[in-house]
Amino acid sequence: IPVQYSSAMRPLDDWIVDRVELVGGPSSFLNGAGAVGGSLDYISKLADRYGDFMEGRVRYGSYDDSEVAFGFNQALGIGPEPKHFVRLDVSRSGGNGYVDRNSRESWNVAFSLLSDLTPDLSHTLALEYQDEQEDSPYWGTPVLNPYAGELKIDKSRRRENYNVADGRYEQRVRWLRSILEYRVSDSTRWRNTFYHYDAERDYRNLETYRYNADNSGVVRSNAFLQRHDQQLNGNRFELQHSQPLFGLASDWALGFDYSINKQTRFPSTASGPFGTVDPASFEPGHFYDLPGMRPGHRKDRSNEVRTSALFAENRLGLTDELSLVTGLRYDHLDLDVRNHRTVTASDPAHFERRWDVLTGRAGLVYQFTPHANVYLQYSTAADPPGGVLTSASFGQVRDYDLSTGDQWELGSKFDFLDGRGSATLAAYRIVRRDFSVADPNNPNLSVPVGQQTSRGIEAAASLRITPKLLAEGNFAWVDAQYDEFTENVGGVAVSRKGKTPPNVPERVGNLWLTYDFDPAWQGGVDARYVSSVYANNANTWHVPSYTVYGTFLSYRLDERTRITGRVRNLTDEVYARFVQSTPLYYVGDPRTFELSVQTRF
């Protein structure tokens, strides 16, 4: 269920998550706009019928990074066939962070009740609550002058935090789902999901830092006070049906989704600059001491997005080996925006806009052996103008049309060496049109891009080399470039055709080796490589490639309990996990140690 706002996608505590699925290619027929290239589906833990258990985990590591978590699944009632099952998962995590004055605390609770109302009808009530607080969030490390070629930082200052002392990020999230499932027959079943999402997010930070001309001081600017108040309510109905079509095996997935997504934003900003500080010794100051900032939140805009969607997918067995997969999705979007501040020509009191979107996919899958297939597919997708309708301004909606895209993908999945190994290979071409990117002069604004093309190859494999040694790895190569994009540079229009978008590595690779010393002891090493990325649209700035290594050793105390020690970034590599065009260098985590104990009984 997408909440249609990227800022809401904060990392979740994995304790309440059952699994994460990569929905590749054209997932748009189920999950809506933005699915060319795939999407991630975070699936929460739910009550089930497969046995009672209790489990827990305790973790502690560098920089006081810690977690305490527990959960249980329990049948309610007495008898050989219980009708109700309950699950509860709770976790508390936190830490002081490797950056000065940065700390974080998070609570996560997930509760679900599964009730078998009849042998064929069941209902699941699922509730989730997340509460996160982060003090003095890290917004990046300033880059040394001059800005040319490879961007560099003062590595001795990698842990400095230039945010104010009372910088803050908070979020409170509540999820409710009511899931009704009915098995009509062996060939037909349906599911109805009512969902409610309520979130409040608060930001209070000083976010931009630059060195002065001789790199002796850091100039701080861009104070940002913000609150997001968001509610999403909707209902999704899904039907699965298997019935021959023209004498051929046929499986259908049909559905309807209606939602109302409303968000009110309360921004206050002051650009500054707010003076120069000595990076060797400075007082971070307090947010409300900054000129132009004062306590309290003032409404800016309320955006309401109503979405009505119909989707259908069919898998048709043309032969025993060859299948045709098709899918269609129709979306009707209604945007209603109300301005709570001063009315101007560029920011009217109220405006509306509507869109009708039809996207789809078609593909062939050939199963040439029981353990190998090859597929070819074409898909289309659409994104809202300006990127996010729940925060879109009048200018963004006026100046942008729907962002569209299409994708060709050719791939194969197969097992080898008598099942000891498995692999996936894919080659793709993605074209995106009429979308937006962050304005390099003001990351809170966006600028339009006409078209971008990406071509790439992805491969993943696992191999049981010996009964005790398992190797897993993946590799991705991509060639991404702007086809139509003109950027305003000092009042002059400059074409960026042929340039690579920032923060897009050409190559990424991962490798994991796991060895079972004996039934109780297990160890492993891992490596991750990311090639150099550009830091601006002109491709005149870049940050270097990096490789980070890790290792772990675990001991099974008994059938229920495992103790694991882990080291990340073994060589204490200093690297940029992300870079902004201001430019700011987001330094990756240093070397860290962790010890955890997990049990289940």
Report each predicted region and the residues it spans:
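Outer-membrane beta-barrel translocator/receptor signature
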Residues: 15-18, 24, 29-109, 117-121, ...
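Repeated loop/turn-to-beta-strand initiation elements of outer-membrane beta-barrel proteins
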Residues: 79-86, 120-123, 187-190, 247, ...
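Acidic/polar loop-and-plug regions of large Gram-negative outer-membrane beta-barrel proteins
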Residues: 93, 97, 110-116, 120-183, ...
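Structural signature of Gram-negative outer-membrane beta-barrels, strongest in the C-terminal barrel
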Residues: 114-118, 230, 248-253, 257-261, ...
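Face-selective signature of the C-terminal outer-membrane beta-barrel domain
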Residues: 174-199, 222-339, 424, 472
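Membrane-embedded beta-barrel scaffold of Gram-negative outer-membrane proteins
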Residues: 179-185, 189-195, 199-207, 367, ...
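Gram-negative outer-membrane beta-barrel transporters
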Residues: 420, 429-431, 448-537, 571, ...
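C-terminal beta-signal and adjacent terminal beta-strands/loops
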Residues: 471, 520, 528-536, 551-601
